[in-house]
Amino acid sequence: FHSGSSLPVVTSQGWTFGVGICFDVRFPEIFRVAAQHGAELFFVAVGGSGHVDQIKPSGDQKHQAKFHVKEMMQLVSARSIDNGMYTFIANQSGKSGNAWFPGYCLAVAPNGKLIGEHSTGEEGMLITEITKQIVKKAKTSAECTVTAVRPDIYANPVIVE
C-alpha cells in the first residue's frame, strides 16, 4: 500500500463527498477537511483482515467481520457526528494470498447511528436511503463541530511547564 498525495472531494449527482481508504479512517483531519469543503458523504474502501491472533486458518470471515464492524463503528460514528455527514464503509471480501477479508458494509448517519449493515462475512450489497435534509440538520446541531474549528489556537499552543 502507498499513501496518496491528495484528498479528493467530488460532486456528483447533486451530492458532495470525500473519498478515503482503510487507514484514513483513523485520521479525523481527513474527514474534517472534506466537510469544510462541502462534503455531505464520505466513502471509505477498506482492506482489513483482522488481527493475526483473530484470523482462523479456516478463514472464518464471520469472526473477522464482527471484530472489524465493532472497531469501525467506534471510529466512523465519531467522524460522522463531528462533521455532520453520512459515512459509508465497504470492506474487501474473500481470500487474497494468505489473508481472508471479512466482507462487510456499513452506512452511518450524520448522528452517528448505524442505518445499514451487511456483515455476514460473505459478499453482498447494502442499500439504504439518505436525505440532504438530515445532513442540513446535522450540520447545524451542537454536535457538529465543523464551523467551531479554531486553527488560530491549534497552530500556536501555549506550552505550560
Predicted regions and their residues:
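CN hydrolase (nitrilase-like) catalytic-core segments centered on the catalytic cysteine
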Residues: 16, 25-125
